[in-house]
């Protein structure tokens, strides 16, 4: 990366966009989401097919927290991993990178991921329609679960965003 590219990258401070999560297997269905992200954190709002906000997700480089708005339940990282096995192999910082259009690092030989998980997981990242790294396909052979996360639109710009107001939603 040359100095000009580094300078441009430093100026990009905010990313937002929309996408869709499609799942089959343990959980079948499709939900839309929107996101707002800084380089070190992200806020994701998931809506059901009729447009109701159903799940709010906060990601930092090391942690995930989610709130189910229908059941008024809050989940920490370990509970999220049980509900969404994809999060066993995609760390929160990698999820943030994906929202920015950067390649997610998943190493099948990563010893920090249990062998049983590594043997049964297939994760592929693809680009589509001019959007870099906009599709994440996950397949768990053991659970016969497929999850596809697709970014439909992504805006990256120099505007500053303050995610503090979104973090306050955790406290209700």
Predicted regions and their residues:
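N-terminal leader/targeting segments and the immediate start of mature chains
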Residues: 1-36, 166-172
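Non-transmembrane domains of secretory- and envelope-associated proteins
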Residues: 68-71, 112-172
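One face of beta-strands
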Residues: 13-19, 27-35, 40-46, 55-57, ...
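Extended, positively charged loop/linker patches that create polyanion-binding surfaces
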Residues: 81-122
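Short linear motifs in intrinsically disordered
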Residues: 9-10, 34, 53-57, 124-129
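Residues that act as N-cap/strand-start positions at coil-to-secondary-structure junctions
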Residues: 27-29, 51, 119
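An acidic-aromatic
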Residues: 41-93
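A short, sequence-level motif marking secondary-structure junctions
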Residues: 36, 60-62, 78-84, 128-131, ...
